[in-house]
Amino acid sequence: MANVVVIGAQWGDEGKGKITDLLSRSADVVVRYQGGVNAGHTIVVEDKVLKLHLIPSGILYPDTICLIGSGTVVDPKVMIKEIKMLEDNDIDISGLKLASTAHVTMPYHRLLDLAMEQKRGDQKIGTTGRGIGPTYADKSQRNGIRIIDLMSREKLQERLQVPLSEKNGLLQKIYGIEPLIIDEIIEEYLDYGKQLKKHIVDCNRTIHQAARKKKNILFEGAQGTLLDLDHGTYPYVTSSNPVSGGACIGAGVGPTLIDRVIGVAKAYTTRVGEGPFPTELHGSINDQLCDRGGEFGTTTGRRRRCGWFDGVIGKYAVEVNGLDCLAITKLDVLDELEEIDICVAYELNGKRIDYFPTSVEDFEKCNPIFKKLPGWRCSTENCRRLEDLPPAAMSYLRFLAELMEVPIAIVSLGANRDQTIVIEDPIHGPKRALLNS
C-alpha cells in the first residue's frame, strides 16, 4: 500500500490531471482535497477531450472511489453539469463521492467575486470570478453553507438568513447590484441537493475505512505551490492550500498516513493572471511555447503567460512540499528550440540569491540568472523509453533533477495517456530509485 499526494510545483496548470489519471490506475481511492471550480484539468481518452473542474481524474476508472473532500468548495450546478457530461460519454460515475462537510459556492459568492475584482481596478489579483475566495471567506467566518445543509429545507433556510442578508446589503449599497431572493435560492439549491444526494458521504470515515483496508489512496491537489494562500506569491494566490500539507487538512488525515509526495512541473513555466513572473518571455518564443503547448486556461480560457523553467521556485516547491520525486510534463513543447534557458538563481538589488523571497515586492525586482542548454531540434512525441530520447533532452532532464535535488519519476510528451515515459512507478516502486544523475 502507498498513499500519495500529487501537487503542482509551479503556478498551477502543470498537467496534474494527466499525471493523476495515470496514477489512478494503481489507486483505490482518489481524493480532491482543496479548491473549487477555479481549477481545471483536461484529460484525453480515446481521442475524447474531457474538461473537468471538480471531479477527480480517477473517475475514468470504474473500480476507483473518487472523493471530493471536506477542504473543497463546491459549485453544485457545475458538478451536476460535469456528471451529465461524463454520463453522456458512457463513463461510470458510481464511484463518485462528495463530502457532506464541503462548503457550497452560492450565487452571491460569484457576484461578489466579480464585483470586488472589478472595483480593484489596476490592483486586481486575477481571480477566475467563480466565487472561490468569498466561499472560503464565509467558511472562515462560520457563515458558510455546507453540502449537508442542502438536504433540509429548514436547515438551509436557517443557515442562509444571515449571510444572504449581509451579502444583499453589500451587493446593493456598494456595488449597485439587485438583491437576491432567498426563496428562489432555497428552491434551486434544494434541487441540487436532491440530485447529488446519492453521492454524499462522510469524508473522514470513507478515507479511514480505506486506509484500514490497506487501500492505495491518491490525494489530488488543485492549482500549484506558488498559488498557495500561505506559501505563494501573496496576494496573487488562491484562497486555499494546494501544498502537500493541505492534503492532511482538506481530507482529514494525519501526516503519518502520507507515504510519498509527487510534484508535477512543466518543462517550462506558465502563469495565469496577475503577479510577478521572473522568467516570463515575450515575443516569438513566448508565442511558440503558448501555441505548441496549447496554453489557454481550462477554466477561464485566458492565454497563459509563458517563461523558461524557474529552478528557484522549483527548489522552493521541493522544500515546502517535501517532494519525493517529480513528473515533468510537456517536454515535447521544447522540441523545436535551438537553445533552452533554465533559471538557476536571481539577481536582487545587485546580489545573487538562490532562494524564493517572501516579499512580493522583492520578487517583482528579481531578475533571472540563466544556464543555457542546447535544444534537440527533433520530435520526442513518440518516445516511450528514456533511451529513445535525444541526448540533449536527456541532459536537460538530468540538469533539472540535479538543480531541484529531487529525482524524476515520469516524463510526459503529449496529452494522450500513452505519450508518457514512466521511469519508476511512484506508487509501487522504491523511493528515489529514479532519474537523478
Curated annotation (Swiss-Prot):
UniProt keyword Magnesium, yes or no: yes
Keywords: Cytoplasm, GTP-binding, Ligase, Magnesium, Metal-binding, Nucleotide-binding, Purine biosynthesis
Free-text comment on the cofactor: Binds 1 Mg(2+) ion per subunit.
Chief localization: cytoplasm
Entry EC number(s): 6.3.4.4
Compartments in which it is found: Cytoplasm
Annotated Gene3D superfamilies: Adenylosuccinate Synthetase, subunit A, domain 1 (3.40.440.10), Adenylosuccinate Synthetase, subunit A, domain 2 (1.10.300.10), Adenylosuccinate Synthetase, subunit A, domain 3 (3.90.170.10)
Protein family per UniProt: Belongs to the adenylosuccinate synthetase family.
UniProt protein name: Adenylosuccinate synthetase
Lineage: Bacteria, Bacillati, Cyanobacteriota, Cyanophyceae, Synechococcales
